[in-house]
């Protein structure tokens, strides 16, 4: 017989919507059967709530979703991990919207990017909205929160090319702008301000995603999640 969750456990799960509580406990929450099942392969399961051990009302109390999906899990966060990729990396400089971060993680998973460098002011990857938006991709993509300018400086000194999307960059669809042999770091910036000046000065290969038609009025910028997908798609296309 499955033991019913206690009131204390339900209250604890609810408290993990706050970052300070997730950090203090070293855990995070995921919702939805598919997302939970994907994450079980990569993270230690601490608590599982299903209709077998929690009522619908109790699941609603624990959920951060408007329409709870019936399965809620608490997982232990990863320990600090080393960067394992020898191919492309993505670096995020102040991406603050949880939905954008979740979309970028899912996009990186699709295009085979296994490590993302994040500035300290990038959104928390264990925020419930981020976890939900990744659709389980967090199991396969590792995020590293670092002093981003310092890390990128070290990588540049090691000879890694640093790509960044800038309005003054080169049209990335022009020949030889993106190499066939791919390694390096693709840097994406903050939703409102783009790439910070300190990081911008480190970029070795500025890229431009051109608007169409050329020289006609258009939107001021692209959503950072969409821009990341466009850049990664072009890199992988050149690598085929």
Regions found by a protein language model. Name each.
Residues 51-62, 87, 204-205:
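Active-site regions of enzymes building and remodeling cell-envelope glycoconjugates
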Residues 110, 125, 132-137, 200-240:
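Structured adenosyl-cofactor binding patch, chiefly the S-adenosyl-L-methionine
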Residues 1-4, 53-57, 141-151, 207:
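Short acidic-hydrophobic, aromatic-tinged amphipathic segments that line or gate anion-handling sites
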Residues 164-219:
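Active-site/ligand-binding-proximal alpha/beta "capping" segment
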Residues 1-50, 122-123, 149:
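Boundary-proximal intrinsically disordered activation/regulatory segments immediately upstream
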Residues 54-79:
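Glycine/small-residue-rich loop that forms an oxyanion/phosphate-binding "nest" at active or ligand-binding sites
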Residues 28-30, 44-51, 74, 161-167, ...:
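Short, hydrophobic beta-strand segments that form beta-sheet elements in well-ordered domains
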Residues 83-169:
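RNA substrate-binding interface of SAM-dependent RNA methyltransferases
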């Amino acid at each position: 017989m499955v033991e019913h969750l206690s009131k204390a456990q339900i209250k604890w799960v609810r408290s993990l919507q706050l970052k300070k509580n997730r950090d203090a406990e070293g855990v995070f929450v995921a919702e939805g059967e598919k997302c939970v099942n994907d994450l079980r392969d990569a993270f230690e399961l601490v608590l599982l709530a299903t209709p077998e051990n929690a009522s619908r009302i109790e699941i609603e109390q624990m959920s951060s979703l408007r329409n709870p999906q019936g399965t809620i899990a608490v997982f232990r966060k990863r320990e600090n991990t080393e960067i394992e990729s020898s191919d492309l990396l993505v670096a995020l400089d102040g991406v603050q919207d949880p939905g954008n971060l979740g979309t970028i993680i899912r996009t990186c998973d699709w295009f085979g990017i296994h490590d993302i460098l994040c500035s300290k002011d990038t959104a928390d990857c264990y925020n419930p909205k981020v976890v939900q938006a990744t659709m389980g991709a967090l199991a396969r993509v590792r995020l590293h929160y670092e002093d981003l300018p310092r890390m990128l400086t070290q990588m540049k000194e090691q000879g890694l090319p640093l790509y960044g999307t800038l309005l003054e960059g080169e049209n990335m669809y022009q020949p030889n702008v993106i190499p066939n042999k791919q390694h390096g770091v693709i840097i994406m910036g903050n939703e409102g301000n783009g790439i910070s000046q300190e990081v911008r000065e480190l970029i070795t290969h500025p890229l431009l995603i051109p608007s169409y038609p050329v020289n006609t009025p258009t939107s001021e910028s692209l959503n950072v999640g969409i821009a990341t997908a466009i850049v990664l798609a072009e890199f992988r296309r050149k690598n085929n």
